[in-house]
Structure formats: structure tokens, C-alpha cells
């Protein structure tokens, strides 16, 4: 039996694939955050007769999206750091393997399903 299957941790090939996905997602999030910053700096000029309430709601939505992206970006950074330190794939809380299926669905998961449910 292969060691990765035995431990529930990704093998070297799986780890490379997950690292590639994390790095790709990080690049997308950084581009989105840059766009949020540019939009915030530019501001939406009020048009004559424009709907101020709608503009305010759009700004709030943009801020919420930027905060979500920043949180995901932070999780990705932690996951990449754990890859470098050899701790990737181990639950932060119980130290058991997170599991292939969970990491495939969410490569920046830091907890196993059970601990994440208890943490939420």
C-alpha cells in the first residue's frame, strides 16, 4: 500500500498539483484585490440624477468581496507555508490528516471536516 494512501496525505505528485492550484488561485485573488483597490481609489462619480443609494450599496458589496478575497488569500498563504514546512494536510486542531477529498475540494483547508464543523 502506498504511503500517501496509508497516511491520508497527498503524495509528491498530488502535493505539486495542489501547490499549482493554490498558486493559481492566489494570482487570481491578487488581481481581483488590485481591481478592488483601483475601483475604491477611483470612486464612482455621481451622475446627475444618479442613484446615490445604489452607488453606496455597490461600494459595500465591493468591500465585502475584497474582504472575502483577502481572507482566502491569507488561508492560501498559510497552506503554502505549511507545504514548505511539511505540515500541509494535517489538521491544525487534532493533527490528524485532513483527507484527500477535502484537500481536493478546498486545497487551503486547515482543518479536517470534524474540526472545521466544531470551529464554525
Spans of model-derived segments:
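Short, cysteine/histidine-rich loop/knuckle motifs that typically chelate Zn2+
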Residues: 93-94, 114
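Short functional micro-motifs and their immediate structural scaffolds
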Residues: 98-99, 117-120
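Short alpha-helical
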Residues: 28, 98, 110
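Cys/His-enriched microdomains
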Residues: 89-92, 110
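Interaction interfaces in information-processing and related assembly proteins
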Residues: 1-85
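Cysteine-rich micro-motifs
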Residues: 109-118
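Short Cys/His-rich "knuckle" micro-motifs
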Residues: 101-106
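Short metal-coordination and nucleic-acid-contact micro-motifs, chiefly zinc-binding Cys/His arrays
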Residues: 84-87, 108
